[in-house]
From Swiss-Prot:
Residues 213-286 form the RRM domain. Belongs to the YME2 family. It is found in: Mitochondrion inner membrane. PANTHER family: MITOCHONDRIAL ESCAPE PROTEIN 2. GO terms for cellular component: mitochondrial inner membrane. This is Mitochondrial escape protein 2. SUPFAM superfamilies: P-loop containing nucleoside triphosphate hydrolases (SSF52540). Residues 48-302 are mitochondrial matrix. The chain crosses the membrane at residues 303-323. Its main location: mitochondrion. The lineage of its organism: Eukaryota, Fungi, Dikarya, Ascomycota, Saccharomycotina. It is a single-pass membrane protein.
Length: 877
């Protein structure tokens, strides 16, 4: 605590000194600007002012520019001059952020000329006494202020002049803040200039010492007490604390406001006290730039790193997800596709000349090729058809094939326009043209349905060999852009690093399943945006009409679901092609169930029409799991008719009649892949019978290698050779067999296992199942060429003997198992006595019947083995 006697003594000492700012420069040199009148007759004491003046005089002998801007020192040459400091002359100082300075310079807020500053000082100080003028103006932009040296009028004391200027500034400030807006603003930000008397020797430097509320006071000579410092510095603003330094030669002052610290530093620096025995030097204490974010991350890694990663992930989602959704919408709507605008008049005008030139070039190349062929092979040109006839025949053949499926195409369109849980499955064997049927002949030729189609080829996803390949393929199918696959590797390393530092995973690394789900989720958002786009237009249109109609006659606005139900063309169509039960790579098996789940959500939310195109019947199980209570609309595409197949072969082989291929193409049926292979073989030099024989041999080898193989190929092989051999014998004699007849054989019991086995064989294209009202009815050959292969294998004695013996042995095994089961039951019944005599009689008859069958089967085996062996067609035995 400071005693009252101490404060009184200090005040008395301060009053006795009677510090008066004179800043007099006598003929003997610049004396101290602060002195006690009673000590004026004493010997001059060495001060900072006299030292600076002497150094300045020595250095500036040969210099012409001795202004304060150059030297940093203001010269006061007589007693009728006074230096005042005006703060807040500039909007912001040089210590403000650089980007804010650029912004202010762009707005021309900080661009002030010295004349403008002079006018501003005169305006805030008005009215100044007559004959008073500013003789020197030194802007100090870093501290937002300026020094002004005034010429005091004769007969006016310096103290009176300074007091009058202060009163004028205060009065003008009150007038400036008279408005309510400025009065309220001044409560938060007082930006009107204030004036202070410069008591020391200001050092006008442009060093990088930016203003701070903390000032360091260095004492040259005797130090001052805290009470003396308070009395000296309090006039510039409220002080927070006065901290003595570790040495008595310095102290620290902390002001409440930055404006007060700037004024004190510029007005007190260089002041001489205690009869010249104490000189004060003031400096801003450098601001310690503490990066609290870096400090927080360094000191709290377990908390900071997950937060930073979460913020980065959120930022990435906010920035890139809208971009990706936009590109997905572009992929679906084909907004920037040439096919979308090819019918426009402007586009036709541009492309028509290009097409003409292209046709000319193509015709020239064809003409040259024909001439070369005619020279190298004379006589063949006359046998060929003209180009026009080839084109017409090709169109006729194509139209013949697709006319057979026109009713099915109309059926699919009708299902789409009905808009009742549009979940359509298009099934058919490989090479039956399912993709062309759906895209080219059903959707793309419809003006309303062609503009919103998302085509997904599942085979591109399933055959990916790495995670990055899978992500790239999926992004390409969905239009998902941009995709940063390198982030997966980086995130894994970051996850390991974070786990090593914090002991827990960051969660930044995601599995490929999660990433694919995110991609399909964003695709769902894009589909919703496209589906509801027309609804938003409808809603706005009806709202505008209702605003013009009188009250009570407003049009009812449909809900979103009702509108989509009435306008099926607004919903995109998702075509999922090559949908299978299992992927080529086992690690990608999750793709098919995930796509099924995703598409089921689209249908349930009434956002899209979904069409599955598959040749794998087993893949429907994924759809049943995704929509267990949904009845799917199904279309089955069979092979082409015999007439269409013959027309195709005649066109491809350029034949005028079918005499050459008659009898050779019937076993091929209408399977397009086999027809194309047949054409390639003939073009390579084989005759039609030779080509057919080789193809039948390959099909036979495929049957024996895959279906009649004794060992289990994979987990999906749930049949045995005896079952396949029985089907081969039945289907070689008839085009189809009834399921009820097949179910009578002991090889195809129980029924649950039989259906699973037949479904698997249908998946591998050995057979084809036909259903009547959802119930299995008939079984036919899956691939037409297999019928000829079946006949060839059965007619071969060696192969027939091998598999017939295996077939009968399997039947014997089944009967022996029955006998063993009946005998076990008889043994258990004997313990009960004669109470179940009828049951014993029944079991005895069953055992006798099975035993008779075993004897019969063994006789057949003996008969088969007694036949002489012969060499088979495969030359394997």
């Amino acid at each position: 605590m400071i005693s009252s006697s101490r404060v009184a003594a200090m005040a008395l000492r301060q009053s006795s000194r009677a510090i008066v700012p004179l800043a007099v420069l006598s003929s003997n040199g610049l004396r101290s600007r602060y002195f006690t009148p009673g000590l004026a007759h004493k010997t001059q004491i060495r001060t900072v002012t006299s030292d600076i003046a002497e150094i300045k005089q020595e250095i500036d002998k040969d210099e012409s520019d001795n202004s304060a801007e150059t030297t940093g020192v203001i010269d006061v040459k007589n007693q009728h001059e006074v230096v005042l400091y005006y703060d807040h002359i500039y909007f912001l100082g040089a210590s403000s952020p650089a980007y804010f300075n650029v912004f202010l310079q762009f707005l021309r807020i900080r661009k002030q000329t010295p004349a403008q500053i002079r006018d501003k000082i005169l305006k805030v100080s008005a009215p100044i006494p007559a004959e008073a003028e500013i003789t020197q103006l030194i802007p100090f932009m870093r501290d937002c202020g300026a020094f002004a040296k005034f010429q005091v009028p004769p007969g006016v004391e310096v103290a009176e002049f300074v007091q009058q200027i202060r009163q004028n500034v205060v009065h003008n400030e009150k007038a400036y803040n008279s408005g309510i807006f400025r009065r309220v603003l001044s409560l938060f930000w007082s930006h009107y200039p204030a004036v202070y008397s410069v008591k020391g020797t200001p050092w006008i430097e442009d060093l990088r010492r930016y203003p701070n509320t903390k000032l360091k006071v260095k004492f040259e000579g005797e130090p001052l007490t805290e009470e003396e410092l308070y009395v000296l510095f309090r006039r510039y603003g409220p002080l927070v604390d006065i901290i003595p330094g570790p040495e008595s030669a310095e102290a620290t002052l902390i002001y409440r406001g930055l404006r007060s610290a700037i004024a004190a530093k510029n007005c007190i620096t260089g002041v001489s006290l205690n009869k010249g025995r104490t000189v004060l030097h003031l400096q801003y204490i450098p601001i310690k730039r503490v990066n609290y974010i870096t400090e927080f991350v360094t000191n709290h890694q377990r908390i900071a790193i997950p937060i930073i990663l979460a913020l980065l992930a959120t930022l990435a989602v906010l920035i890139f997800d809208p971009i990706r959704q936009y590109f997905i919408e572009v992929k679906i709507t084909k907004r920037y596709s040439f096919d979308t605008y090819k019918d426009y008049a402007v586009v036709k005008t541009i492309t028509k000349p290009l097409r003409v030139v292209h046709n000319w070039l193509s015709s020239s190349y064809d003409y040259i090729d024909k001439k070369i062929d005619s020279i190298s092979s004379p006589g063949t040109a006359s046998d060929e058809k003209s180009d026009d006839s080839d084109v017409s025949q090709a169109l006729q053949t194509a139209s013949t094939i697709w006319n057979e499926r026109s009713e099915k195409s109309k059926q699919i369109k009708m299902w789409i326009y009905e808009n009742v849980n549009t979940f359509i499955i298009v099934k058919g064997p490989k090479g039956s043209g399912k993709e062309e049927f759906i895209l080219d002949h059903t959707l793309l030729n419809d003006e309303k349905l062609r503009h919103k189609i998302l085509y997904i080829n599942c085979s591109e996803l399933a055959k990916a060999r790495s995670d990055n390949d899978l992500l790239k393929s999926t992004a390409n199918q969905l239009g998902y852009f941009p995709l940063f696959t390198w982030t997966n590797t980086v995130s894994q390393f970051v996850d390991l690093g974070v786990q090593g530092l914090t002991g827990q995973k960051s969660g930044l690394s995601e599995s490929k399943e999660t990433q694919l789900k995110n991609m399909f989720t964003l695709t769902s958002q894009a589909i919703r945006s496209i589906a509801t786009r027309d609804y938003q237009k409808y809603h706005a249109s009806v709202t505008r009409k209702n605003n013009r109609l009188p009250e009570g006659e407003n049009i009812e606005i449909l809900k979103e679901e009702e509108y989509l139900q009435q306008h099926p063309e607004c919903k995109p169509i998702v075509v999922i092609d090559k949908f299978n039960r299992k992927a080529d790579a086992a690690s990608n098996d999750f793709v098919y169930p995930m796509i099924a789940e995703w598409s089921s959500v689209l249908v349930q939310n009434n956002l899209a029409h979904v069409i599955y195109v598959t040749s794998d019947v087993g893949s429907i199980q994924h759809l049943n799991n995704a929509l267990p209570n949904q009845v799917f609309k199904s279309i089955s595409l069979s092979d082409a008719s015999s007439f269409s197949a013959k027309s195709f072969l005649m066109h491809q082989l350029k034949l005028e009649d079918d005499h050459t291929i008659s009898g050779a193409f019937e076993p091929l049926g209408g399977r397009m892949l086999d027809l194309q292979a047949f054409v390639r073989r003939i073009n390579s030099g084989e005759t039609p019978p030779e080509a057919l024989e080789e193809m039948v041999n390959q099909a036979s080898e495929q049957v024996t290698t895959f279906f009649l193989c004794a060992h289990k190929i994979d987990d999906d092989t749930n049949w045995n050779a005896a079952q396949v051999w029985m089907l081969m014998k039945l289907l070689s004699k008839s085009d189809s067999i009834n399921y009820s007849d097949l179910n009578k054989s002991p090889l195809f019991k129980p029924e649950e296992d039989t259906v699973a086995t037949l479904t698997t064989l249908e998946k591998h294209d050995l057979i084809s199942l036909q259903r009547d009202k959802g119930i299995l009815d008939k079984i036919s050959i899956g691939r037409p060429l297999f019928k000829a292969a079946f006949k060839q294998l059965i007619s071969d004695p060696k192969i027939s003997k091998l598999y017939e013996v295996d077939y009968i042995s399997t039947l014997i095994k089944i009967e022996n198992e029955k006998i063993k089961k009946f005998e076990g039951e008889l043994i258990s019944i004997q313990k009960l006595g004669d109470k179940l005599g009828s049951r014993v009689l029944y079991l005895s008859k069953k055992i006798d019947a099975s035993n008779a069958k075993v004897v019969e089967y063994e006789g057949k085996i003996a008969e088969i083995n007694s036949k002489p062996a012969s060499k088979n067609f495969l030359k394997l035995f």
